[in-house]
Curated annotation (Swiss-Prot):
Biological source species: Saccharomyces cerevisiae (strain ATCC 204508 / S288c) (Baker's yeast)
UniProt catalytic activity: a 5'-end NAD(+)-phospho-ribonucleoside in mRNA + H2O = a 5'-end phospho-ribonucleoside in mRNA + NAD(+) + H(+); a 5'-end (N(7)-methyl 5'-triphosphoguanosine)-ribonucleoside-ribonucleotide in mRNA + H2O = a (N(7)-methyl 5'-triphosphoguanosine)-nucleoside + a 5'-end phospho-ribonucleoside in mRNA + H(+); a 5'-end triphospho-ribonucleoside in mRNA + H2O = a 5'-end phospho-ribonucleoside in mRNA + diphosphate + H(+)
Gene for this chain: RAI1
Name under which the protein is recorded: Decapping nuclease RAI1
GO biological-process terms attached to the record: cleavage in ITS2 between 5.8S rRNA and LSU-rRNA of tricistronic rRNA transcript (SSU-rRNA, 5.8S rRNA, LSU-rRNA); deadenylation-independent decapping of nuclear-transcribed mRNA; maturation of 5.8S rRNA from tricistronic rRNA transcript (SSU-rRNA, 5.8S rRNA, LSU-rRNA); maturation of LSU-rRNA from tricistronic rRNA transcript (SSU-rRNA, 5.8S rRNA, LSU-rRNA); mRNA processing; NAD-cap decapping; nuclear polyadenylation-dependent rRNA catabolic process; nuclear-transcribed mRNA catabolic process
Keyword Nucleus (UniProt): yes
Function: Decapping enzyme for NAD-capped RNAs: specifically hydrolyzes the nicotinamide adenine dinucleotide (NAD) cap from a subset of RNAs by removing the entire NAD moiety from the 5'-end of an NAD-capped RNA. The NAD-cap is present at the 5'-end of some RNAs and snoRNAs. In contrast to the canonical 5'-end N7 methylguanosine (m7G) cap, the NAD cap promotes mRNA decay. Also acts as a non-canonical decapping enzyme that removes the entire cap structure of m7G capped or incompletely capped RNAs.
Family indicated by similarity: Belongs to the DXO/Dom3Z family.
Cellular component annotations (GO), alphabetically ordered: cytosol; Las1 complex; nucleus; RNA polymerase II termination complex
Subcellular location: Nucleus
């Protein structure tokens, strides 16, 4: 009988100790699903002067020409770029990276959100492999598709909802340049409003961080550099998160925005992105204002305005500490890279995280253990070659 365990999501740990996030690498993933390690080709640079707002920028412009390459990816949840970046770092240092859990920021955020959201709003369907003393966590691609289909069905999705999603990508397109300002021709700057908006190219920062005694490596998509990039240095302090939302017009809107800001804070604090920039649009999708928030000041801001949401920041950290500690306690980890890999399923249902070991008779077993559903053969061989 394999490992099986449940964790009630209303439980909290006592730890609030966080390790300072540090960038250990980065890569670009292209719209053609190529992974360019230590390559910042897809890194964008923030540029949105206040004067631009006077132009009444239309965030719905270009909706019909939107290109979503991401939906056609063969494996949109792939750990390949993350693993190749880790291997590159290990080859440089000649030793295995010191970490307990390796995954994406989005997965860590989903697990933390279990303490605040229902399974219908926050679908969690993860696979975990225990290899070489570390846990590698990946989302099931089918779960991503199902979650999107479910939310679309429940909401009675219409063109306005697709348009609202598009305005987020449009805001990013209007607010960023592909190169630093000094290297960007005036013609490119002036024609930004005409650029075709697409979704597929990504720049990913790979960050070492931790909570309590658990050390994590998280991959996180970065929207842009706010000021300048330092070559060969940790650039976390220069990154910014871009978001777009509806104007705040009344108390109800305020509470809705506070909940959004909490989720954005969660995204940013996990990997140490210090700056959040929100664009606010009116009912006609015109960009009206842009506001900047300091990630570290968001908990204080929320606490002063809405104590209930403000207390969620500390609750999130306590739950983060507990759930990572629980995973490390429940899942056996053998340091020997030649030992048998073990695979597990983690889902969120009925107010519990449910962990179960995947047995040899399960149809997923072969792909997770012997195949490349999570770990590539190249990465497994690399680890076996490390002394």
């Amino acid at each position: 009988m394999g490992v099986s365990a449940n964790l009630f999501v209303k439980q909290r740990g006592s730890t609030t100790a966080l390790k300072q996030p540090k960038e250990i690498g980065f890569y670009s993933r292209t719209k053609d699903e190529e992974y360019l390690i230590s390559d910042d080709t897809n890194l964008n640079y923030y540029y949105l002067p206040d004067a631009e707002l006077d132009r009444k920028l239309d965030l719905s412009s270009g909706f019909q020409k939107f290109k979503d390459y991401y939906k056609d990816f063969e494996d949109r949840c792939s750990l390949r770029g993350l693993l190749e970046t880790i291997e590159s770092s290990e080859r440089h240092k000649g030793k295995k990276i010191n970490a307990d859990i390796i995954t994406f920021r989005g997965i860590a955020r989903k697990l933390i959100s279990c303490a605040f959201d229902s399974p219908s709003f926050n679908t969690v369907d993860l696979r975990i492999v225990s290899f070489n003393g570390q846990l590698f966590i990946k989302e099931v691609p089918e779960a991503v598709n199902a979650a999107k289909a479910s939310s679309a069905t429940e909401a009675g999705r219409n063109i306005n909802q697709d348009l609202n999603v598009f305005t987020g990508y449009k805001f990013e397109t209007l607010a960023t340049l592909s190169n630093p300002l000094q290297y960007t021709p005036r013609e490119v700057i002036e024609k930004r409003t005409k650029r075709i908006v697409s979704h597929g190219d990504e720049y990913i920062s790979v960050v070492r961080t931790g909570v309590g005694n658990c050390k994590l490596i998280l991959g996180a998509e970065v929207d842009c550099i706010f000021d300048f990039k330092e070559n060969g240095r940790d650039n976390l302090k220069h990154y910014a998160e871009l978001k777009c939302t509806q104007q705040v017009a009344n108390i109800s809107d305020t509470h809705k925005f506070e909940r959004k800001l909490f989720r954005t804070w969660l995204q940013c604090f996990l990997v140490g992105i210090p700056r959040i920039i929100y664009g606010f649009k009116d009912d006609h999708y015109v960009l009206k204002t842009v506001e900047e928030f300091s990630t570290e000041e968001v908990p204080v801001l929320l606490k002063n305005n809405n104590p209930q949401v403000g207390s969620a920041c500390l609750e999130a950290i306590k739950w983060y500490g507990l759930l990572t500690e629980w995973l490390l306690k429940m899942i056996p980890r053998d340091e020997d890279p030649h030992s048998q890999i073990r695979a597990f399923k983690l889902v969120f249902e009925n107010n519990h995280l449910r962990l179960s070991e995947i047995e040899e008779s399960d149809e997923e077993y072969s792909g997770l253990i012997d195949g490349e559903h999570i770990l590539s053969n190249g990465f497994k061989e690399w680890r076996k070659s490390l002394k």
